[in-house]
Amino acid sequence: MDIPVEFLTAQEPLSYGHIPPVYWKELLNWIDRILTHNQATPNTWEATHMVLLKLHGTLSFSNPAQLPLVAAACLQIAAKHTEAHSRLADPDYITMLGDGVYTKPSLLLTETMALFIVGGHVGAYTLAACDWLLGSLPFSQAENDLLHPYMYHYIKLSYRHRTPDYHSSPALRAAVVIAAAVKGADLLEMNMLFIMMYHLTHISTASLSLGLTHFTAALQRQINLDFAEAEQREAAERRALLEREREQQLQEARERLDDVMAVLEAEVAITITTATEGTDAEDTSEVDVINVVDPIG
């Protein structure tokens, strides 16, 4: 059961964002025959892994024109044979993927990168594939902001130090695994991804451990930065809140003081008026008494 010859003899380059419908239809028919023949279960990883094994050694990974085709096929398989992803509609374009279609893009990204790793292509093809994948998967802007720096950092760093023989360079393979897992999976999910990739690519334990160490350190630095920024925001919000509360308390104190002053002024005015009236009455009495006493004197 061979792949259609059209895929191996294609002369025109296939862009990273669009795959001609004729290629899609032929490839999906071929994949359907494989999956039907092997009675695949509707499980994302099992279905994709099965086709990975079938594709291994069949496609020419030295041909950059086939990279997006293979990557798109892997994503299409994962969507096609998983019930939760049945909303994927038009198979002619991979770029029509929308928010909410994939519930675990990190897993799909890992599976697709596994295809490139198994194929053994290197260097610029890997980076081009990452560019294409990042442009195709439905990541939010916030997720892209997190994913881009780590992916390019690890892949380019490992590519710079690669050995001539790709298969003797586990660092590059580990880098792609790390980049694929950086999507933001929790620790349990991330460990599962690494375990699957370990069995698929035979990354050495030392390389995997080193990769996890670097990944954890980088992630911790990012977490620390995010935490520091969050603390600064919270401190600024607390200062603003305290300032507002202080102003409110001062305003309430001023209002209470004004009320007290008004009461005091009223009481003082009453006291002064009463005192003045009392003094006038006493003066008149004294004059009367004097007038009475004077004749006797």
Swiss-Prot record:
Compartments, as annotated in UniProt: Host nucleus
Domain named Cyclin N-terminal: residues: 21-113
Protein name: Retroviral cyclin
Coiled-coil boundaries: 222-270
One CC-aspect GO term: host cell nucleus
Role summary: Transforming protein which induces the development of dermal sarcomas. Induces positive and negative regulation of transcription from host and viral promoters by interacting with various cellular factors involved in protein transcription regulation.
Domain notes: Contains two known functional domains, a cyclin box motif and a carboxy terminal transcription activation domain.
Transcription activation domain, as annotated region: 21-113
Biological processes, Gene Ontology terms: symbiont-mediated perturbation of host cell cycle progression
Presence of the UniProt keyword Repressor in the record: yes
Homology family: Belongs to the cyclin family.
Oligomeric form and interacting partners: Interacts (via transcription activation domain) with host TAF9 in vitro. Interacts with host CDK3 and CDK8.
Taxonomic source organism: Walleye dermal sarcoma virus (WDSV)
Protein's gene: orfA
